[in-house]
Design a protein with these regions (language model features):
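FAD-binding subdomain of flavoenzyme oxidoreductases
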Residues: 21-25, 31-200
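Glycine-rich N-terminal segment of FAD-binding domains in flavoprotein oxidoreductases
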Residues: 1-19, 34, 55
Length: 200
């Protein structure tokens, strides 16, 4: 489903058994590269000794895989402070339907195949700019549909700190319909020094 509803005939791939490793943690840069079947709590347990965590804190963190969270553009209770998945994914390595493995990331670093995809999507964004401006939901936690506004941000929060384009953000929220993820490069955050619970 593209918006969270049930699906009819579909292919569901469970990566959580064989495709769940932490491939790299760069403490200095505050990044981690992971396979899509890794469960969020398992990642955060490995990051805790480094004083880091992945701040997209969904309530199902004991079961939620990073690939599934990316596919859904998951948020979490602290998304107002940290953003949702699209704000915390720096890159993705993914297979296209042709079987070609492509690196998705900052536009300035794209290889020829990814640059061609970026050019095509940018053309769509320009062609439909008026419709995007008129109809794109102006909400902080938009989690449904393709992020066609990566070239002309319509989100209240910029996708990147410097406003640059990151093609990996096109895959976030696409629920695997554009490519099949091999790995994700994630932006980490320092562990909070204190936590507060407010009850209304």
């Amino acid at each position: 489903s593209q918006c969270g509803q049930t699906t009819g005939a579909a292919l569901v791939i469970d990566n959580s058994k064989h495709f769940r490793r932490v491939l790299d943690v760069n403490v200095e840069e505050g990044t981690a590269t992971v396979e899509p079947g890794l469960v969020l709590d398992h990642l955060n347990a490995q990051l805790k000794p480094h004083g880091l965590w992945y701040p997209v804190d969904v309530s199902t963190s004991a079961q939620a895989t990073l690939g599934g969270m990316a596919g859904n553009n998951s948020c979490g209770s602290r998304s107002i402070a940290y953003g949702n998945m699209v704000h915390n994914v720096l890159g993705a390595s993914a297979w296209l339907s042709s079987g070609e493995l492509v690196e998705f990331g900052p536009q300035a670093t794209l290889g020829p195949r990814a640059a061609g995809i970026a050019q095509f999507v940018h053309g769509l964004a320009v062609e439909h700019r008026e419709q995007i401006h008129a109809n794109w939901p102006k909400v902080l936690r938009r989690v449904a549909g393709y992020n066609l506004d990566i070239f002309d941000n319509q989100n209240e929060r910029p996708y990147t700190a410097d406003g640059s384009v990151n093609l990996a953000h096109l895959l976030i929220g696409a629920e695997g319909t554009l490519a099949y993820t091999k790995s994700l490069k994630l932006k980490l955050a320092p562990l909070p020094r204190a936590k507060v619970l407010g009850i209304v």
